[in-house]
Amino acid sequence: MDFPFMKQSKEGEVSGKMGQSVVLTGMVLQTMPIGEYDKRITLLTKERGKVTAFAKGARRPNSSLLAACAPFAFGEFEMYEGRTSYNVKKADISNYFRELTMELECTYYGFYFLEMADYFSQENNDEQEILKLLYQTLKALENPSLPNRLIRCIYELKMLVINGIYPNVFSCQLCGKRENLVDFSVERAGMLCMECAGRERGIRLEDSVLYAMQFIISSELRSLYTFTVSEAVLKQLEQILFGYLQKYVAHTFKSEQFLCL
């Protein structure tokens, strides 16, 4: 299926000039109260990457922007583009991800995914792949047949792929051989073959773990959440990604603490 934001952008139909209205398709990543009734929101958009916007009166109980300016809200946002900021005029929300927010654990995972997308995305940059990944991942959280821990592993690894800092799981990092890959080395950022594994410290992987990582890295976004794994495989995936993120991202995500409760 197509993503809901693959259709023609309306940005040029309203205006692309500063000081006029623009329509951007995106998702609310975070919000912050401003004054008594206003909000400042961070949006990840198809057209302009990450943007910050102000929503006047969005905290009033009768405001049409109350629900539209909440985390996870996805849709089209019509905004006035000023010299240094955007101001939300109205929004047409196509998905609030309400099913996700009805489950506390799913909500915690969702906020972690939003925070990671916020960390990796930039303003005035093409972030469509991150937006697509985020949308697909939140949809997966609403699927009770997929373990949330597996969804997290898939999301983290694919985010690394999009940002070009993913491990090499297709050949040995020391000799380049593509056969008999047995150990994963965080230090080497990838796999080691049987011959080289004796010279380096690594994690001995089950074949299913290697296949899962290869699938996640090479698959299109729409195919990511189409498989499950055993508990043993899942634990190794978690071990690998935890160590890899610690070394190559080295950022503390505040929402991650709630996933350990």
Regions found by a protein language model. Name each.
Residues D2-L261:
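Non-catalytic alpha-helical scaffolds and adjoining flexible linkers that form interface surfaces
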